[in-house]
Amino acid sequence: MNFVDRKAELSFFNHILHREHPGPAQFIILYGRRRVGKTHLLRHWAKESGIKHTYWAAEKESAPNQRRKLFAKVDNRTVAQSPLFNSWAELWEAIAQVIGQERQILILDELPYATDGDPAMLSALQHAWDQHFQHSQLILVICGSQVQSMETLQHRQSPLFGRFTGQWFLQPLPFHTLKTFFPNWSAAERVAVRSIVGGIPAYIQWLDPTKSLVENIQKQILFPEACS
């Protein structure tokens, strides 16, 4: 997928890279509906940052498997080489030792899958932040598509309440970006496609800019198997 616009979002995240208050360590939450481009944004920003970065996406699986895969990512080893951790607290302790004082980005995507597998994950992460990460050079970013669950993380009842140093709710792409995707389409066609796909990057990418809007509707929308 080509990277288009997101200037405000990139400005926010780039500011995070150099912010010294409340400290060099930063704890950011990014959320938004599915397919709005959260993962693509974070991967692009992390790659362009020029510093070490780790991306991990939680899956619908057991907590021990999630912990093992996360540590493998952070420690740059295979899952088979990664030890088993009995708890999230044990895992975060190990990750804190691996990271140390090195400046780096750690992205935890689809976080609700991890908390669904073991609700204790959040309190363990809160403890790790308080005891280790907030005193480090780490930029920790958590991300998720379950908007209500992600908003709950910011409530007073959440273990993570008061820990976030920044938050961003990612919106669909604005209308003007459609001209970049479809430079040869008329304004009317771009208005029409906006009403159909709603500025969602993943859906925009399904459309062929070399074909007319009508042709795209016939191929991609009336015959949804074409998008599978």
Question: Locations of the language-model features?
Answer:
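Phosphate-binding site recognition
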Residues: 1-228
